[in-house]
């Protein structure tokens, strides 16, 4: 296997964690607070970027500059992740994240309709919100996303044992003590080698052992398995999947990662959503780190077309 190497071009354009967080602001939400980036300009057109597991708003740092000339770009750190506060009850299930996210939306002075860009579990949150607030959604972009329930492990043979382990007591140790998702999974799902300062930005929120790492363990335990999964999550995914399959008037874009991690399986589900444009960028799971400019340009072009068609 070829060793990963640093990309000198990425070094030249590098944004460190402290530099990124300095651009962000914080807002009190319920019994905690949300840390977020807000470009503010073009407020009449808002695009909300949502990250997933093991990540933060930092993931989108090289993508959003492409979209900022045409829309207000807003990127939160999900509760308990990045620089956002901890949840009041110490729980980080899908519905906990959704509760804080929707309360935060109410405080943002958003336009009547928004565009979502969701990755990983961030796409799941975007889909769920879109299903529950169909009159507030202008378009959706998604990548490496949770598009449907998992009926059988035949669909995901490579990760069956991993998920069983994550759900066990050994999984608790693997994540809460050894920081599996941030220190092992995240860098393994990026093609290039992250600069030390970049990796430090992902690591910083989860440096301490124990409950601060709970969000990264809770997410994979939410995977919507029909047999053995959480019934409420399975129902949430069934609901938004049915809605998206019938959403002929809702523009969508699916960004496929090549060679990808989940993309090969997800693309078949995404094909069942009408009015979807398909594009492809290089990458494994976190293509924002391997092809940020390509991703940003695709999203900008899509957003521009959506806005033009509204006129």
Curated annotation (Swiss-Prot):
Residues holding substrate: 162, 285
Report which reactions are catalysed by this protein: coelenterazine h + O2 = excited coelenteramide h monoanion + hnu + CO2 + H(+)
Q: Which residues form the AB hydrolase-1 domain?
A: 45-291
Q: Which GO terms describe its cellular component?
A: membrane
Biological process terms from the Gene Ontology for this record are:
bioluminescence
Spell out the Gene3D superfamilies in the cross-references: alpha/beta hydrolase
Q: How does activity change as temperature rises?
A: Optimum temperature is 32 degrees Celsius.
Q: How does activity depend on pH?
A: Optimum pH is 7.4.
Enzyme superclass (EC): oxidoreductase
Q: Which Pfam families match?
A: Abhydrolase_1
Enzyme Commission number(s): 1.13.12.5
Q: Which GO terms describe its molecular function?
A: carboxy-lyase activity; Renilla-luciferin 2-monooxygenase activity
User: Which keywords belong to this entry?
Assistant: Decarboxylase, Luminescence, Lyase, Monooxygenase, Oxidoreductase, Photoprotein
Matches recorded under InterPro entries: AB_hydrolase_1 (IPR000073), AB_hydrolase_fold (IPR029058), AB_hydrolase_sf (IPR050266), Epox_hydrolase-like (IPR000639)
The protein's assembly and partners:
Monomer.
The free-text function statement in the UniProt record for this protein reads: Upon binding the substrate, the enzyme catalyzes an oxygenation, producing a very short-lived hydroperoxide that cyclizes into a dioxetanone structure, which collapses, releasing a CO(2) molecule. The spontaneous breakdown of the dioxetanone releases the energy (about 50 kcal/mole) that is necessary to generate the excited state of the coelenteramide product, which is the singlet form of the monoanion. In vivo the product undergoes the process of nonradiative energy transfer to an accessory protein, a green fluorescent protein (GFP), which results in green bioluminescence.
Extra remark beyond the main annotation: This luciferase produces light with a wavelength of 480 nm. In presence of a green fluorescence protein (GFP) it produces a green fluorescence at 509 nm.
The protein's name is Coelenterazine h 2-monooxygenase
């Amino acid at each position: 296997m070829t060793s990963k190497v640093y990309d000198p071009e990425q070094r030249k354009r590098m944004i460190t964690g402290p530099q990124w967080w300095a651009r962000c602001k914080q807002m009190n939400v319920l019994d905690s607070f949300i840390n977020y980036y807000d470009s503010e300009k073009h407020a009449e057109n808002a695009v909300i970027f949502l990250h997933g597991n093991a990540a933060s708003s930092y993931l989108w740092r090289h993508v959003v500059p492409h979209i900022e000339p045409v829309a207000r770009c807003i990127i939160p750190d999900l509760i308990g992740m990045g620089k956002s506060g901890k949840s009041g009850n110490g729980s980080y299930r899908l519905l906990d994240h959704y509760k804080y996210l929707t309360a935060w939306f109410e405080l943002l002075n958003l336009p009547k309709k928004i565009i979502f860009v969701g990755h990983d579990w961030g796409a799941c949150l975007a889909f769920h919100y879109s299903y529950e607030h169909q009159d507030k959604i202008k378009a959706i972009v998604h990548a490496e996303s949770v598009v449907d329930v998992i009926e059988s492990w035949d669909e995901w043979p490579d990760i069956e044992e991993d998920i069983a382990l994550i759900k066990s007591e050994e999984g608790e140790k693997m994540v809460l003590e050894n920081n599996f998702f941030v220190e092992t999974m995240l860098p393994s799902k990026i093609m290039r080698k992250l600069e030390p300062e970049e990796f430090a930005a992902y690591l910083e929120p989860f440096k301490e052992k124990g409950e601060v790492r709970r969000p990264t363990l809770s997410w994979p335990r939410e995977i919507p398995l029909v047999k053995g999964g959480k019934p409420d999550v399975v129902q949430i995914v069934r609901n938004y999947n049915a809605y998206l399959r019938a959403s002929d008037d809702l523009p969508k874009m699916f960004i496929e990662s090549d060679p990808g991690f989940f993309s090969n399986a997800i693309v078949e589900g995404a094909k069942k959503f009408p009015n979807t444009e398909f594009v492809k960028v290089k990458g494994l799971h976190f293509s924002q780190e391997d092809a940020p400019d390509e991703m940003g340009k695709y999203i900008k072009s899509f957003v521009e077309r959506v806005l033009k068609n509204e006129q």
